[in-house]
Regions:
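Flexible loop/turn connectors
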Residues: 3-102
């Protein structure tokens, strides 16, 4: 996909580790990050700030999500089948140097 004439200008990876794989593939294809390809990851893991250029990523509230999941398991373990619950969590875009405006 990165060697195509109509290649994408940006890739959103499912997590930061996958984004590192995109960095490797982009460099093998001779692409510069972010000049030729913007890359965004997800999870804001430590590697996102250590690679070059530092990865723009999405941070999710891991503890809050874990706490909500544990609360739901406790409710279900106590015999409450209840209705399915829909919860939403605030995500944060951590802008670093792997993206640019086109």
């Amino acid at each position: 996909i990165l060697n195509r004439h109509d290649r994408p200008t940006a890739i959103f990876a499912g997590n930061d580790e996958m984004a590192v794989g995109v960095y490797v593939a982009a460099r093998k294809a001779g692409l510069r990050i972010p000049e030729d390809l913007s890359i965004v990851g997800f999870d804001d893991t430590p590697i996102s700030a250590r690679i070059w250029p530092p990865l723009t990523t999405v941070r999710s509230p891991i503890r809050e999500v874990g706490r909500a999941a544990a609360d739901l398991l406790v409710k279900r373990g106590a015999g409450s089948s209840g209705n399915q619950e829909l919860q939403s969590f605030q995500l944060e875009l951590v802008v670093r140097e792997s993206t640019r405006t086109i």
